[in-house]
């Protein structure tokens, strides 16, 4: 008897991105069994067929061997009967488990090869993120729309994208984030309630469009390295409370802060300082370095200060177009 689809997967709309998840056609409407039921030999579901009678008690179920995905399950904690020691593919494994409050204790992050959307939609998850080492190609949607509020440590090698990684999560506190190979992070930290976003290591980032989109509570960004950034469309769209960017590293592409009327003078002055090479603090002198012209857009509240301090003149001399608007 295959245990690949035990009734611990609740009947419901499976993830359309998860080809291995059971479909409604494969499950009866009440296809929900508990680990206690299984251990007591009461009821189980295999490929949607209800089995009753006495089952041989199971001490452990190998999640990897049985190919089990728990998407849409309703339990708060993963029953101990499930053994995760051989799991390498976490993709979609707890997708939309809305009642799950904690992660399995025996996850071996060093063995994982796929974590796409692993904990997406876990709206009750109370655990702190403490993940290292992790070597995967993508962090796409790993904690998207989850209840995660704190990252202690997130250290990931090889990952190219962090698309939607923490989008619409409850993230308010970030410790160490080391993402040395991430190139695109669209919406990665968008629509979160964080107030102060610390310095993170993400040196190869090229596309940070919408990365902080709609972070209405975010007041400060400690540091951002633009050395390799080629696209920053709507990076700060909806960041109405943003007042400070602690360090701007080699900005040389178009950027808008039109949605941020409270940018402080220290931050505005940083746009008047030039950086002649990647890794240096300041804005690139585009003309002097032979780089393409680009535009900077500020909220109209900053116009008087930038004019008075001569920052607009400095920027336009170096092929920057300076615009002002009340919103993006």
Enumerate the language-model features and the residues they cover:
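Negatively charged
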Residues: 2-5, 10-328
